[in-house]
Amino acid sequence: MSDIPSDLHYTAEHEWIRRSREDTVRVGLTDFAQSTLGDVVFVQLPEVGAELAAGKSFGEVESTKSVSDLYAPVSGTVSAVNTDLEGSPQLVNSDPYGAGWLLDVHVSDVGALESAIATLLDAETYRGTLTK
């Protein structure tokens, strides 16, 4: 079974978020997603300062099996991108919850962030969505 840390929130699109500050979240792909994708060979991410809309595509991940869209779990402004993925996209496979993170999103309205997080899945609920 895939690794599903209990301290994260999850989307139906197999992305995780971790609150790093009151107004900022870190976003990445789940262990299930990376194992389903196979070897990741390229990750396309937006520039710092780009505006994201929850539920809308913000980039792509290309693997030996397919190209998949990445979807924003929250609305906000990209405050950091993982530039290590440019030269080492395989970090998404080897360390999806650590060095393989994708981007940080700053949300100016903390109340809106609280509401957005409340709509995401906890670890147990996410685990229940996975096909065995």
From Swiss-Prot:
Binds 1 lipoyl cofactor covalently. Pfam families: GCV_H. InterPro entries: 2-oxoA_DH_lipoyl-BS (IPR003016), Biotin_lipoyl (IPR000089), GCV_H (IPR002930), GCV_H/Fam206 (IPR033753), GCV_H_sub (IPR017453), Single_hybrid_motif (IPR011053). The modification N6-lipoyllysine is found at K65. The keyword Protease does not apply. Its cofactor is (R)-lipoate. The keyword Isomerase does not apply. GO terms for cellular component: cytosol; glycine cleavage complex. CDD domains: GCS_H. Disulfide bonds: none annotated. The glycine cleavage system is composed of four proteins: P, T, L and H. NCBIfam families: gcvH (TIGR00527), PRK01202.1 (NF002270). This is Glycine cleavage system H protein. It comes from Mycobacterium leprae (strain TN). The lineage of its organism: Bacteria, Bacillati, Actinomycetota, Actinomycetes, Mycobacteriales.
